[in-house]
C-alpha cells in the first residue's frame, strides 16, 4: 500500500481524534467542543506533516519552530496497523528537512528509544510544565 505525505495543517478533526484514540492518547470520550477544536494545535503549528493511505489519515506529526535555532516535535502518531513500516521515521525526516540547521527537541519517555534510533540524543536538561486543561 502506497503512503502519500502532505503538509496541510487543517486536518479533519474526526480523523485526528480517531488516530489519537488508536494510539491510546484519547480514551474515546470527547465533547462536541473538543472535537470541533481538535485540529487547532495543528493549524497553529509551524509545520504539520501527515501520512495517508487510500484517503485515510494513518500518521501525523507537528512541529513548532523559530525557523532558525530550535524546533520541537509534538504529537507524532502512527496508526498501530501501520507502525514499523518507516512512516514515523519519514514524518520526522520531512520535518527536519524544513529546518535542517535547527536543534530538534522532543519531550518523551515512552518513545525515547524510537527517537534515539533515528538520531536524537538524550538531553539531561530538566523540563517543567503546567498541565493543560484538556487532559
What positions do the PLM features span?
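Short amphipathic alpha-helix that is part of the acyltransferase structural core
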Residues: 1-32
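Generic structural signal for conserved hydrophobic packing positions in ordered secondary structure
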Residues: 16, 73, 104-106
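Short, basic, glycine/proline-bearing loop/turn elements
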Residues: 20-24, 75-80
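Active-site rim helix/loop that mediates acceptor-substrate recognition in acyltransferases
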Residues: 25-48
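A generic local structural motif
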Residues: 33-37, 90-94, 115
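Conserved beta-strand in the GNAT
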Residues: 50, 56-65, 72, 77
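Conserved acetyl-CoA-binding loop-helix of GNAT-fold acetyltransferases
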Residues: 78, 84-97
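Conserved active-site alpha-helix within GNAT-family acetyltransferase domains
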Residues: 98, 103-135
Amino acid at each position: 500500500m502506497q503512503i502519500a505525505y502532505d503538509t496541510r495543517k487543517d486536518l479533519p478533526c474526526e480523523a485526528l481524534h480517531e488516530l489519537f484514540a488508536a494510539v491510546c492518547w484519547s480514551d474515546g470520550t470527547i465533547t462536541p467542543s473538543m472535537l470541533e477544536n481538535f485540529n487547532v494545535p495543528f493549524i497553529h503549528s509551524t509545520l504539520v506533516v501527515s501520512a495517508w493511505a487510500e484517503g485515510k489519515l494513518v500518521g501525523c506529526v507537528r512541529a513548532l519552530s523559530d525557523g532558525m535555532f530550535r524546533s520541537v516535535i509534538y504529537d507524532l502518531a502512527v496508526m498501530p496497523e501501520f507502525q514499523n513500516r518507516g512512516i514515523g521515521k519519514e514524518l520526522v525526516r520531512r520535518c527536519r528537512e524544513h529546518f535542517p540547521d535547527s536543534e530538534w527537541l522532543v519531550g518523551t519517555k515512552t518513545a525515547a528509544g524510537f527517537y534515539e534510533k533515528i538520531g536524537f540524543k538524550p538531553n539531561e536538561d530538566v523540563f517543567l510544565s503546567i498541565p493543560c486543561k484538556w487532559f
